């Protein structure tokens, strides 16, 4: 029988192998790496949570501040309502009394015609007086006719109309009635060509400072609910008329400008129509006021995308104006945009030269297009003070060259006069009709009468007829036979001796004319080049 080991006896422990030791080492390394990854992960989560918590705190603080500001604004609006109403009521009373006085004066002066507001105005004071008179009487039609008849006085109107609208009982209603003839729909018919969009824009711009609250400013417009509702209806009517006009692409820029200014003036911008506003602004981006209107209708957040769209459409100059309006000069540097605009203008001019069959007219169009581009870029450089980044000297030199070339082309070419030279014997001049003989070549050569029109046919010519080349590209006079000439030709009339040696022997024959083809061709080329 085998011996049973004594439990109390010490036995020798088995030595671990090298493979087991490597396994344990690998396991420890894996655990360490896993622990490190988990630790980093939880640390990252903690940091993200801290950042989000901080962002939430800032948002809550911002919302609290906005809420507090809104509450204060509402409280201020509520407190100032009575004061604003009192001010407006006092102004309405004053305007009503002034309107009654104006009507009484008009009634008293109607007999002698001294109250004609539509007549000529000599100075700025007279312009303001006439505008105030029309506004006091709420004469919308007279006010409209007065403004539209003075487009040349646009700057004076822009400064005087707000002062005149202040005296109006209901300036907002007066403006809506005044522009109703052409906005939202032109009711004058298709035959009328006058575009009064400029007048609508000026009147709407002039109304804006008049209807702001005298206490809290632009945040509250002093427009009655009925007038504001009418303004909304007008805007909806204009939007519906887009389909009849051929959609946005075919709408005139003055109409677009009037519509957007109408929205801003009466504070009736709709957030759901921002896509429409963007299309309208981009389609009329070359208009000077479009960047400001774009911000006013709520497109400020979309400005970067709109600027990129303008650049992709080749409207770099318009993109520069939009960039400065919203302060994105760092993102869209203006100088590269202006240089790209000039390069595109040159490419467009080159395409005109390649496609045009009339080289002279194409050259004129190319020069005019380049002039317009240079003037626009120079104006932009001056407006935004970019002289250091984009020196304008070379552009000005090129513009001067184009102007000089244009001036030289306008000078008339030196055309030789059709003078009738005297005969060699110092006799009187031939009749004026002699210069209008059929097929006679008109040039600076001495006049040579055709033998078929000679008063006698017996005497031979003093010298043989010149060769055919003397008539250049014209046909030589055909030698009609005397038998086929109608009527009889008698001798030379009294006072008109024989001319240039035809049919009269005693008169010495002049030297035959010498034709210089090179001189004639050069003159003809010069004249043609000038004409085109």
Swiss-Prot record:
Species name: Arabidopsis thaliana
Family per record: Belongs to the Frigida family.
BP term (GO), one: cell differentiation
Gene: FRL4A
InterPro entries: Frigida (IPR012474)
UniProt tissue specificity: Expressed in leaves, shoot apex, flowers and during seed development.
Annotated region described as Disordered, given as residue ranges: 406-432
Statement: the UniProt record of this protein carries the keyword Lipid biosynthesis: no
Region forming the signal peptide: none
Pfam families: Frigida (PF07899)
Disulfide bond entries: none
Protein name according to UniProt: FRIGIDA-like protein 4a
Keywords associated with the record: Developmental protein, Differentiation, Flowering
């Amino acid at each position: 029988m085998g011996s049973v080991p004594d439990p109390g006896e010490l036995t020798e422990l088995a030595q671990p192998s090298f493979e087991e030791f490597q396994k344990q080492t690998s396991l420890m390394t894996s655990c360490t790496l896993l622990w490190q990854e988990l630790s980093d992960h939880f640390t990252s989560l903690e940091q993200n949570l801290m950042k989000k918590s901080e962002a939430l705190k800032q948002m809550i603080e911002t919302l609290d501040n906005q809420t507090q500001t809104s509450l204060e604004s509402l409280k201020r609006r509520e407190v100032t309502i009575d004061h604003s109403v009192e001010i407006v009521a006092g102004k309405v009373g004053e305007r009503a009394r002034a309107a009654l006085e104006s009507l009484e004066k008009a009634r008293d002066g109607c007999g002698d015609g001294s109250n004609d507001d539509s007549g000529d105005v000599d100075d700025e004071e007279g312009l303001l007086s006439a505008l105030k008179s029309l506004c006091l009487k709420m004469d919308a039609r007279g006010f409209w006719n007065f403004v539209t008849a003075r487009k040349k006085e646009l700057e004076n109107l822009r400064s005087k109309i707000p002062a005149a609208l202040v005296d109006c009982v209901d300036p907002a209603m007066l403006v809506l009635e005044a522009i109703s003839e052409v906005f939202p729909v032109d009711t004058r018919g298709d035959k009328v060509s006058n575009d009064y969009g400029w007048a609508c824009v000026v009147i709407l711009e002039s109304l804006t400072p008049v209807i702001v609250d005298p206490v809290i400013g632009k945040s509250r417009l002093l427009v009655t609910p009925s007038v504001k509702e009418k303004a909304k209806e007008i805007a909806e009517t204009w939007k519906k008329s887009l389909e009849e006009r051929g959609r946005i692409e075919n709408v005139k820029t003055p109409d677009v400008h009037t519509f957007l200014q109408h929205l801003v003036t009466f504070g009736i911008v709709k957030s759901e129509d921002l896509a429409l506003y963007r299309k309208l602004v981009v389609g009329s981006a070359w208009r000077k006021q479009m960047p400001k209107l774009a911000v006013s209708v709520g497109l400020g957040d979309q400005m970067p995308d709109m600027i990129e769209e303008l650049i992709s459409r080749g409207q770099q100059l318009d993109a520069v104006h939009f960039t400065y309006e919203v302060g994105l000069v760092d993102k869209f540097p203006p100088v590269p945009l202006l240089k790209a605009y000039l390069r595109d203008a040159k490419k467009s001019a080159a395409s005109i030269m390649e496609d045009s069959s009339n080289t002279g007219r194409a050259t004129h169009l190319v020069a005019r297009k380049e002039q317009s581009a240079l003037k626009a870029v120079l104006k932009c450089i001056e407006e935004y003070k970019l002289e250091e980044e984009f020196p304008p000297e070379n552009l000005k030199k090129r513009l001067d060259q184009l102007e000089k070339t244009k001036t030289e082309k306008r000078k008339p070419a030196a055309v030789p006069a059709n003078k009738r030279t005297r005969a060699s014997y110092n006799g009187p001049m031939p009749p004026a009709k002699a210069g209008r003989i059929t097929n006679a070549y008109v040039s600076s050569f001495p006049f040579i009468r055709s033998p078929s029109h000679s008063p006698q046919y017996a005497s031979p010519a003093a010298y043989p007829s010149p060769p055919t080349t003397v008539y250049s590209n014209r046909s030589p006079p055909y030698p009609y036979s005397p038998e086929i000439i109608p009527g009889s030709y008698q001798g030379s009339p009294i006072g008109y001796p024989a001319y240039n040696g035809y049919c009269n022997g005693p008169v010495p024959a002049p030297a035959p004319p010498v034709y210089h083809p090179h001189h004639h061709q050069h003159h003809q080329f010069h004249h043609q080049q000038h004409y085109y």
